[in-house]
From Swiss-Prot:
Keywords: Cell projection, Coiled coil, Cytoplasm, Membrane, Phosphoprotein
Pfam families according to UniProt: Stathmin (PF00836)
PROSITE patterns, sorted: STATHMIN_1, STATHMIN_2, STATHMIN_3
Organism encoding this protein: Xenopus laevis
Lineage, top ranks: Eukaryota, Metazoa, Chordata, Craniata, Vertebrata
Domain SLD, chain residue ranges per copy: 38-178
Gene3D superfamilies in the cross-refs: 6.10.280.30
Ranges in coiled-coil conformation: 75-178
Tissue-specificity statement: Nervous tissue.
Protein name stated in the entry: Stathmin-2-B
Gene Ontology CC, one term: cytoplasm
Location(s), subcellular: Cytoplasm; Membrane; Cell projection, Lamellipodium
InterPro entries tied to this protein: Stathmin_CS (IPR030514), Stathmin_fam (IPR000956), Stathmin_sf (IPR036002)
Length: 178
């Protein structure tokens, strides 16, 4: 009895809910292992947990089917010498036009490169001139500061010399009077 219950449980797991409901209405099992379409038949070979396998059977072509049609290439019309010459001239004009367009694009590109180079040189010159002006101003400022510093040192030195002279003079007067 336990084996029957286990087998029933396994069968219930395999069946979908729709199959379960349908099995209540139709007690005999349906063969859902084969499906038929217009020109083929699909048979289910086996069903496993890892996947399913199918066999695809193509029906032979019916005798009424049409034979494959071969498409006839359109007839070539005779081309005159004038038409060939006109086509060649048009092709030559197209080629010349393309060459002229390419040359024009190259000239524009060269002109743009020249403008970019000129602008870079101009910016470089401006930068150099500005840097030189800044350097000259800085050097002038340093020179002025140095002159001011030296002048202040000389002034202090003169002040010390005057003070030393006053001290000597006072000392001499003390020695003479004393």
């Amino acid at each position: 009895m336990a084996k029957t219950a286990i087998a029933y449980k396994e069968k219930m797991k395999e069946l979908s809910m729709l199959s379960l409901i349908c099995s209540c209405f139709y007690p005999e099992p349906r063969n859902i292992a084969a499906y038929t379409f217009d020109d083929m038949e699909v048979k289910q070979l086996n069903k496993r947990a890892s996947g399913q396998a199918f066999e695809l059977i193509l029906k032979p072509p019916s005798p009424v089917s049409e034979a494959p049609r071969t498409l006839a290439s359109p007839k070539r019309k005779d081309v005159s010498l004038e038409e060939i010459q006109a086509k060649l001239e048009a092709a030559e004009e197209r080629r010349k036009s393309q060459e002229a367009q390419i040359l024009k694009q190259l000239a524009e590109k060269r002109e743009h490169e020249r403008e970019v180079l000129q602008k870079a040189l101009e910016e470089n010159n401006n930068f150099s001139r500005m840097a030189e002006e800044k350097l000259v101003l800085k050097m002038e400022q340093i020179k002025e500061n140095r002159e001011y510093y030296l002048a202040s040192l000389m002034e202090r030195l003169k002040e010390k010399e005057r003070h030393a002279a006053d001290v000597r003079k006072n000392k001499e007067q003390l020695e003479l009077s004393g």
